[in-house]
Structures are given as structure tokens and as C-alpha cells.
Amino acid sequence: MFRHVAQNLGSRNTSIQSYRLLRTRWERGYLKDLYHRRQILGADPAISRSSYPNCSVQVRNHHCSADKSTLQWAPIKTSIDNSSDDFAANTAEMKVLVEDLKAKISKIEQAGGEKAVKLHRSRGKMLARERIDGIVDAGSPFIEFSQLAGYEMYGKEEVPSGGILTGVGIVSGRVCVIVANDATVKGGTYYPITVKKHLRAQEIARENKLPCIYLVDSGGANLPRQADIFADSQHFGRIFYNQATMSSEGIPQLAVVMGSCTAGGAYVPAMSDQAIIVKGTGTVFLGGPPLVKAATGEEISAEELGGADLHCGESGVTDYYAHNDKHALYLARSCIAGLPPVEEHMTFNPNADEPLYPAEEIYGIVGSNLKKTYDVREVIARIVDGSRFHEFKERYGETLVTGFATIYGQRVGILANNGVLFAESAMKGSHFIELCCQRKIPLLFLQNITGFMVGRDAEAGGIAKHGAKLVTAVACAKVPKITVLVGGSYGAGNYGMCGRGYSPRYVFMWPNSRISVMGGEQAANVLSTVQKEKKKREGADWTDQQDLELRKPVEEKFEKEGHPYFASARLWDDGVIDPKDTRKVLGLAFQSTLQKPIPETKFGVFRM
């Protein structure tokens, strides 16, 4: 979720607000370090930056100049009456959803609770979010992934954010993936959802060739749940497999040991390219003091067994000796600053034109009622640079809007639902995806889809084969793909519009969205019809009361399981976001895809 942390650092370019305005005024000594490292990086040392500072740092042949060729694209002319009753009602509905989301995020950010936080601080340790704030460039954006991970998944056990924080941010001018254990949540131990979230962060790093920074403070596996954590292919061991293979692919791996690093978790620093450890709090060992005593009878402290002095001076497991958390973060930033420069393969312009219309108007356009229709172009107009949109096949397959735009200077091809998908819509989408792949233009999918058209006429018109063309095109496309659920995501429509199963680089959801194999009402209708036919064959009655008793639990189940909180808790997405922050989210998300060359796309057989 997009959130701000108050910061008074002088004048700022507020054209692009950050996810979090980073807390940098910890103490004078740290500010001196910050001043010094900004000079090292060739940046203006003044602590007053835009949300995308120093965009050219560590980038070869990259400039932030605007691509003026797109300026001739006509802006979308809005037809929205923001003084209408409908607009006001939609706005009120969406604000309720957004405030509920913010309230849940606020509670989650309290981490393991007041007692656990107090104990954590008493050990001289920074909280996980403070550590992230300390390593990311001052004033730069940070996307925190899946804050709702684990939400209501473990009964009375609360696991805020799944016990681990992950995200993408800019460190020493370089876009990086950050993984930070939260030791205030069950000692930072790994639940099944913790493992899944850690692996998802590594997947994002691999897909986009982003350096990984691990801020380690974990007691290892959650032993009571070991059967769901340890042995399978996508369980705990996969973390280290990913570290090894990513390192072999030239994706930097950096570990900062800031707390416990026990048992299998000890391999996180041991398998990293570089490792930092904090004196007094950071420990690395395969077997802790209790296990050592049980096995050998030796009594030894954690620091003596696996502390900074031992691993920096004797074992060589770690490479850099930090005196405290802040020093460790400074060393980590220095390590990232020492990486070779990268060549970005697309254009990113932090000073691009803002949309002509306020992002807050999205509330009044969309609302919370998925049955209400609206022109999705109005949403596009509040996301893209200058509201400029070069529409493709405007008069054909009108229930799928396709066209070209730029987001912070990066050209993107947009596919946005404007109704049910017909054969013509599917063919249009396939054509457009092929065009973008040939030109190596990233794709943005705005999902609000009930599915493909059904009925005899649709089947006779080849909806199955034409829908398959769209699904094939989406599956085979090698350009970066990002999906935002702005409404419903139902059935095969989810597949045709690049759902999670089709490897988009990122998936984000709005709080009004829903995701299911079909809507609850439709599912109840199907099951009701099946029961009626069955009773009819048996010669039995099917009363209205029986029908109601069947329908109600089905509709309730689908409503619960289709809710964005349910989906995000299980990592079916990368986060539920405030609709008005969509442009900013997409800005950093697309920027993170710039590091990796786009390969050629080869399509399979299209049934004609």
C-alpha cells in the first residue's frame, strides 16, 4: 500500500510522491553519514530530493529526458461530471473501502504488538520497517509487497505481514528487492505464508534481474508447522536454491545479519555474495547454544558461538563488521554502490507530465458496485502521462480498450476491459499483444472482466478458439507484464487478462475488486439449477425455502473467498493498493523492469 511518513526536509518536487517519505532524522551522526554517501554517489548532498532522486546514478547510457514523439498523441477528453450525485455516491463508497484498508494496514504495521516491540528495542535493534527506511535512498519510493499476507489465515494466531517485509526500492541509485525479517512477530520464524512471501520476492528479483538485500533477523522455521514448511519443492530449502542460482546468473545477493540467523537460516549469509553482521545482536549458527549443550555438553553464549567477532575474525562467514544496525545499513548501501553500473533497456522519466485530471477522481468514476458500468478510458486518463492515449482499433471489439501511452516516460501497451469479451475483442487483444511484443513494449492489463461471452451464437462464432488466441498471446508474451485488478476478475477472463497464472511481473488489486471462478450469484444459480433438475428426475419437490438454504451459503462463501483481503492474504497478488496511487505504484514497478533485456517472443499455434 502507498503510505507516507512525515518528513520535514525542506523544499521537495512533489510531482511524484513516494510510497514512504523515509525517516532520516534519527541523529546527527547518521545525517553526516547520509551527507557523505550522497557526495560519494555524485548526488547533490542537500537532503531535499524528488521522489525519484538521482535517476541517472549507476545507469549507463540512460537519460531522463522526455520522449517528445509521444506528445502528438491526443489526450483523452473526460466526460465525467464530478458534481453529479452518482459521482458523489461512488466517491463515498470507495472512500469507505480505502479507509478500511488503511485501518488494517495501520494495525499490521504495529507488528508483533507493543510488548514485542519494546523487547526488540531494548536489545538496541531497529524495527524491520525502520531498517528498510534506513537503507533506501532518502525521499525515494518504496513498494511494500503483500502487507496483508497471512491475514486471518491462522485462526487466533496473528502473523502481521506474514512475519516478513518484502518490497522494491532504490538503494544507492539502484533498484533492489529487499527482504526483512520481522523478529517482533513470533521471533521472525517462518510460517508457510512467510516462506511463500520470501520466495515471491526472490521471483520478482529474478524476473527483473534486481539485486537482493536480506535484512536477517529470524529464528528459522516455525517448528509446530514444519510439515508445511520444510520438505516440498517450494518450501524453505528453495530460498537457498534461489540464492545460489541467482548468484550464478549475476544477480547480486547481499545479507545483513541483524539478529538471529539459526539452523537452515544460517545459509542466507553463507550463500550470499557479501555478508554484513552486527556486533552484539547478529548471530549465525547451524545449532544454537541449547542444541550445542544437549549434543556436546558445552555451555556457550550465542555471541561466542556465532557472533560478529567469530565470523568476521575466524570463520570468514561474514565480510563486514558493523557496530550497530545503522552502521550495518550504511555498509549495505556502500556494497550496493560498489556494484557495476547497469544499462536500462527502456526510458524512465521522473519529470514526465502528470495526468490532466486528479487521481482522486478515480473514486467517483469506479465506486464499489461492480454491476455499475463506466468507460475505462476515464481511468486510463488519470494514470498515464498527460492523459495522452493512442488508441488501437477504437471501433472494433469495443469491449476491450487497447492502445499506447507512457507512464513516467516509459511506453506501455494498455489492455483494459470495457465489458464482456466477445470474439472480436479477443482477436483485437491478440493482435495488439503481438504488436507490442514485436516492438518490445511492456504491457499493462486493467482487469474488470466477467469472462468471455457465452451462448449458441458466441460458440458458433468461435469464441473458444478466439479466446484461446488471447490466452496464448498473453502466455507467450515475453515483454514485462503488469496487471491491476480494478474491478471483477472472473473465470477465463482472468486468464485472458493476464492473471497470476500468466506470470505478470506484478499483480495489484484495488479494494473494490473481486476474484473468483464466477460471481457468487452466478454460482448459486448454477448449483440451484443442478439441484432442481436432479429433484425433477427423482420426482421430488424443490421448495423455495430449500433453494434459499442452498443459495445463501454459496453466495456468502464466494463473497468471502473473492474478497481482495482473502486473495492478498494468500499472495494471489502483490498488494492491495489505494486506486489514487496506481500511477505511482506503476511508476516504480515499471522502472524495476528496466534492468533486464526483453527477449524475442515466439508464439505457439493459433487456431484460425
From Swiss-Prot:
Q: In which pathway does it act?
A: Amino-acid degradation; L-leucine degradation; (S)-3-hydroxy-3-methylglutaryl-CoA from 3-isovaleryl-CoA: step 2/3
State whether keyword ATP-binding applies: yes
**Where found in the cell?**
Mitochondrion matrix
Q: Which Gene3D superfamilies match?
A: 2-enoyl-CoA Hydratase, Chain A, domain 1
- Catalyzed reactions: 3-methylbut-2-enoyl-CoA + hydrogencarbonate + ATP = 3-methyl-(2E)-glutaconyl-CoA + ADP + phosphate + H(+)
A single GO CC term for this protein reads:
mitochondrial matrix
Query: Which parts of the sequence are annotated with region: Acyl-CoA binding?
Result: 388-417
EC number(s): the record gives: 6.4.1.4
Going by the UniProt record, its keywords in alphabetical order are: ATP-binding, Ligase, Mitochondrion, Nucleotide-binding, Transit peptide
Checking InterPro entries in the record gives: AcCoA_carboxyl_beta, ClpP/crotonase-like_dom_sf, COA_CT_C, COA_CT_N, MCCB/AccD1-like
Q: Where is the CoA carboxyltransferase N-terminal domain?
A: 94-351
Q: Give the protein name, as stated in the record.
A: Probable methylcrotonoyl-CoA carboxylase beta chain, mitochondrial
The UniProt annotation puts the transit peptide over 1-61
Specify the domain of life of the species encoding this protein.
Answer: Eukaryota
GO BP annotation list? L-leucine catabolic process
Q: Does the keyword Transcription regulation apply?
A: no
What GO molecular function annotations does the UniProt record carry, in alphabetical order? ATP binding; methylcrotonoyl-CoA carboxylase activity
Q: Name one Pfam family in it.
A: Carboxyl_trans
Chain segments carrying region Carboxyltransferase: 94-600
